[in-house]
Curated annotation (Swiss-Prot):
Catalytic machinery residues: 199
Encoding gene, per UniProt annotation: argJ
EC nos: 2.3.1.35, 2.3.1.1
Residues under site feature: Involved in the stabilization of negative charge on the oxyanion by the formation of the oxyanion hole: 125-126
NCBIfam families tied to this protein: ArgJ, PRK05388.1
A matching Pfam family: ArgJ
Name by which UniProt lists this protein: Arginine biosynthesis bifunctional protein ArgJ
Family matches, as PANTHER family: ARGININE BIOSYNTHESIS BIFUNCTIONAL PROTEIN ARGJ, ARGININE BIOSYNTHESIS BIFUNCTIONAL PROTEIN ARGJ, MITOCHONDRIAL
Subunit composition and interactions: Heterotetramer of two alpha and two beta chains.
Lineage: Bacteria, Pseudomonadati, Pseudomonadota, Alphaproteobacteria, Hyphomicrobiales
Subcellular location: Cytoplasm
Organism expressing this protein natively: Nitrobacter winogradskyi (strain ATCC 25391 / DSM 10237 / CIP 104748 / NCIMB 11846 / Nb-255)
UniProt KW keywords: Acyltransferase, Amino-acid biosynthesis, Arginine biosynthesis, Autocatalytic cleavage, Cytoplasm, Multifunctional enzyme, Transferase
Associated pathway: Amino-acid biosynthesis; L-arginine biosynthesis; L-ornithine and N-acetyl-L-glutamate from L-glutamate and N(2)-acetyl-L-ornithine (cyclic): step 1/1; Amino-acid biosynthesis; L-arginine biosynthesis; N(2)-acetyl-L-ornithine from L-glutamate: step 1/4
Length: 417
């Protein structure tokens, strides 16, 4: 966790309301950091349903494997459940020791929460390859269970931070049937961000009565154009985890129970749910390690949406493009390079490129009306849009990233120090 807040941090941070059936507590367990909280315990009432999406890394962390096993058949807790998140140690690439640590953590948490170990969800973030000493949770989780309260959202968001410079929270309130329901979300992530099914860590909570199957469908569809459309450094983490919990408490106020993601009564909820995911995903991009500029990459006129996504990712992940943005240089030649290397259909002589709405290249060459002074002024903004039109079809997609600065190198060069 950095002491200097990113200049791209949101200026308007919402107060997250309480959600019936959710209680939170945090503590400093000394996992890696000193003088700050590094453990989150979330307690969820009986009847809570759960859904999750995770990294596609072939080297997943032990907590990811643990959660996947819990969700195999769609989880519905009969006696309540709990979520334990620690920062500072990813418990990844830790072999048998790591798997034993997850079992020990789940056992300690189950005793504290009064449920079964199979009703415990785990997530870890931090250094890869170092064993996690789960005995540090002894006593800590019991205390947290007794202290858990429904209004600790900001504390929860802070406890899961690593190199993040600000806590990431989002909320929405919407009608489901005749009842108002709430959606709250927290996230962390600033580096090793190129999610594939999730982000580094993100947790969504709602009081809507939704079955695990329907919630899983909502989550899978929601991440595609939110968390999966964000990249900081092209590195997909071993620990990417996005979990959603629905307590169903709004059912007592008249909210209908939803068992199908396509239920028309869910339309407003789906929009709000995706909005929370999009808000959190953008905050992750804004907090990219060392970032000074938020970058939106748009690709239009591709042969398909999938092709546009791949080209947009090629541009967004290019160190040459990202350093040019950091240097406030509208270097469209580097964008051309990134389009060309993407391995997708592209016609050089149909290519046009825009920086913040100013066309700098047209039909495969520099725009005849190019004005260096106008473009240079636009590049000083802290939000940069790069739009590329291919002229081949109707495929369009959008990816968020940030610039690449000297600070990124410094942060990651000193990460284990």
């Amino acid at each position: 966790m950095s002491t200097a807040i990113s200049p791209l941090a949101p200026t308007d941070v919402p107060d997250l309301p309480e959600i019936a059936g959710v209680r939170l507590a945090t503590a400093a367990a000394g996992i890696r950091y000193k003088g700050r909280t590094d453990v989150l315990l979330a307690l969820l009432d009986e009847g809570t349903t759960v859904a999750g999406v995770f990294t596609r890394s072939r080297c997943p962390s032990a907590p990811v494997e643990w959660c996947r096993a819990r969700l195999k058949d769609g989880h519905h807790a009969k006696a309540g459940l709990a979520l334990v998140v620690n920062s500072g140690n990813a418990n990844a690439f830790t072999g048998k020791t790591g798997r034993q640590a997850t079992k020990l953590t789940a056992g300690i948490a189950a005793k504290a929460a009064g449920c079964k170990a199979s009703d415990i969800y785990l997530a870890s973030t931090g250094v890869i390859g170092e064993p996690l000493d789960a005995t540090k949770f002894n006593g800590v989780l019991e205390t947290l269970a007794s202290e858990a309260a429904p209004d600790r959202w900001m504390d929860a968001a802070r406890a899961i931070m690593t190199t993040d410079t600000f806590p990431k929270v989002a909320t929405a309130r919407v009608k489901l049937g005749k009842a108002a329901v709430t959606i709250n979300g927290i996230a962390k992530g600033a580096g090793m961000i190129a999610p594939d099914m999730a982000t580094m860590l993100s947790f969504i909570f709602t009081d809507a009565p939704i079955t695990a199957t329907a919630l899983q469908s909502l989550l899978k569809s929601g991440v595609e154009d939110t968390f999966n459309a964000v990249t900081i450094d092209s590195d997909t983490s071993t620990s990417d985890t996005l979990l959603a919990f629905a307590t169903g408490a709004a059912g007592a106020r008249g909210a209908p129970r939803i068992s199908r993601a396509g239920d028309p009564r869910l339309k407003a909820f789906v929009k709000a749910f995706h909005g929370v995911l999009a808000d959190l995903a953008e905050q992750v991009a804004r907090d990219g390690e060392g970032a000074r500029k938020l970058v939106e990459v748009i690709v239009e006129g591709a042969t398909s949406k999938a092709s546009a996504r791949k080209i947009a990712k090629s541009i967004a992940n290019s160190p040459l493009v990202k350093t040019a943005i950091a240097g406030e240089d509208a270097n469209w030649g580097r964008v051309v390079m990134a389009v060309g290397k993407a391995g997708e259909p592209a016609d050089r002589d149909k290519l046009s490129i825009y920086f913040n709405g100013i066309r700098v290249a047209k039909s495969g060459a520099r725009d005849p009306s190019y004005d260096e002074a106008e473009v240079s002024k636009a590049m000083k903004n802290d939000r940069i849009q790069i739009k590329t039109t291919l002229g081949l079809g109707k495929g369009r997609d959008r990816v968020l990233t940030c610039d690449l600065t000297k600070e990124y190198v410094a942060i990651n060069g000193d990460y284990r120090s």
